[in-house]
């Protein structure tokens, strides 16, 4: 198991949930956290603990984002008009690495970030190598020609464990995706319950 995969599954164990819906997740076999004290029975969480856990789960889902980066995304969501929790989800789903993952160009969100960073993707015909790049509705994301036959890409397309959401249009023959619109929470196919309103409460304390 690679260091990246080990880190990913550590997040699953820490949360006690299979947050990406992966068949190989260790929480499918056990229901306790990582480390030597992982099997201890957990007590009831305080309100702060519940909010913190919701933040860690959402932050972890999008590739274990750094706290400074995640907080900056939240701050922008809070500045925008409308519901902050919905704005937060919209900003996270507009990230280029998130769209590459949703389009099933790669098997995991961790792989999506690396895939983008290595220059395998273009946006509207221009190569972009920043995973946090924010896409707009109508943007066309394409896997570069020389990258279309990479093993990780071919394996991802064949994965049956998740579907492409309806706010992204994909042609897997051409390896092209169009970001149709910024989604709301109810649009996003999270395998587990995400509670961005608790993230808002956490940062509003």
Swiss-Prot record:
PROSITE patterns listed in its UniProt record: RIBOSOMAL_S4 (PS00632), S4 (PS50889)
Superkingdom of the source species: Bacteria
Classification of source organism: Bacteria, Pseudomonadati, Pseudomonadota, Alphaproteobacteria, Hyphomicrobiales
| SMART domains in UniProt | Ribosomal_S4, S4
According to the entry, every stretch annotated as the S4 RNA-binding domain falls at 94-157
Any Pfam family: Ribosomal_S4
Compositionally biased spans, kind Basic and acidic residues:
1-16
Describe the task this protein carries out. Answer: One of the primary rRNA binding proteins, it binds directly to 16S rRNA where it nucleates assembly of the body of the 30S subunit. With S5 and S12 plays an important role in translational accuracy.
Family affiliation:
Belongs to the universal ribosomal protein uS4 family.
Q: Which NCBIfam families would you find in this protein's record?
A: PRK05327.1 (NF003717), rpsD_bact (TIGR01017)
**Assembly and interactions?**
Part of the 30S ribosomal subunit. Contacts protein S5. The interaction surface between S4 and S5 is involved in control of translational fidelity.
GO molecular-function annotation terms? rRNA binding; structural constituent of ribosome
Spell out the protein name for this chain: Small ribosomal subunit protein uS4
Task: Please provide the Gene Ontology terms (biological process) for this protein.
Answer: ribosomal small subunit biogenesis; translation
Keyword terms, alphabetized: Ribonucleoprotein, Ribosomal protein, RNA-binding, rRNA-binding
